[in-house]
């Protein structure tokens, strides 16, 4: 069952035989416990890609012919999962979404450096770092890379269709970091079945950090729930079979 931040803090304080509170800000201990709950939440989010955090996203196009194949990830993206581009030619009404494959920066540069910039279908663009890049201007993109884990650089664009790559032609999904509101009635964005593990982990951390006492029962339950969630996640992804 899902619980609010206040309900989680109240449960933790009750297990620690602390004073009852009606708000997370009532006492220094309740405030400290709420901060530990927050850090536990983000630690739990970071240790796997939670299916419920996978969302469609819209890339941000450069909007400048100086960098026609540059696009930027929006804020809050943890990991890009899928990237397709509509490769329909000008005048075609049927959509042609095709996968665009990732190459690491070294492999991307090696591939692009085989191009001959004396040919009319090759542009020389300058990245924001000042590095020159060779790109094709007569076809939709097939590959992309990133030099800073934020800006995506594609290998080509079709100048007969668009002057730059268009975000309206992108199909993309990514794992997103959920937002946090430090309020009594805030409900952390986790599946209902993950709350037991989440709360037990927070209990163990609060017991140790606030009382310097190891809560063996909470640690054991957190470990048991964590193992169960791990098996469940892999089963969804086609890993462990029962």
Regions found by a protein language model. Give the residues of each.
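Glycine-enriched, solvent-exposed interface loops adjoining structured elements
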Residues: 1-242
């Amino acid at each position: 069952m899902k619980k609010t931040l206040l309900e989680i803090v109240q449960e933790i304080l009750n297990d620690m035989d602390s004073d009852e509170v009606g708000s997370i800000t009532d006492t220094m201990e309740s405030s400290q416990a709420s901060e530990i709950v927050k850090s536990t939440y983000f630690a739990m989010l970071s240790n796997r890609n939670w299916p419920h955090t996978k969302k469609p996203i819209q890339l941000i196009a450069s909007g400048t012919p100086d960098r026609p194949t540059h696009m930027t990830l929006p804020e809050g993206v943890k990991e890009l999962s899928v990237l397709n581009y509509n490769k329909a030619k000008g005048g075609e009404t049927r959509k042609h979404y095709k996968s665009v494959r990732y190459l690491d920066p070294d492999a991307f540069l090696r591939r692009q450096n085989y191009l001959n910039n004396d040919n009319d279908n090759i542009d020389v663009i300058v990245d924001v770092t000042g590095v020159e890049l060779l790109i094709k201007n007569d076809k939709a993109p097939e590959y992309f890379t990133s030099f800073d884990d934020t800006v995506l650089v594609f290998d080509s664009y079709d100048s007969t269709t668009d002057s730059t790559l268009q975000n309206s032609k992108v199909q993309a999904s990514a794992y997103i970091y959920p937002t946090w509101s430090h309020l009594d009635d805030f409900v952390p964005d986790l599946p209902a079945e993950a709350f037991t593990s989440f709360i037990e982990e927070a209990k163990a951390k609060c017991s140790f950090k606030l009382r310097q006492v190891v809560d063996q029962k909470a640690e054991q339950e957190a470990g048991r729930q964590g193992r169960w969630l791990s098996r469940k996640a892999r089963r969804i992804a086609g890993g462990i079979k029962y």
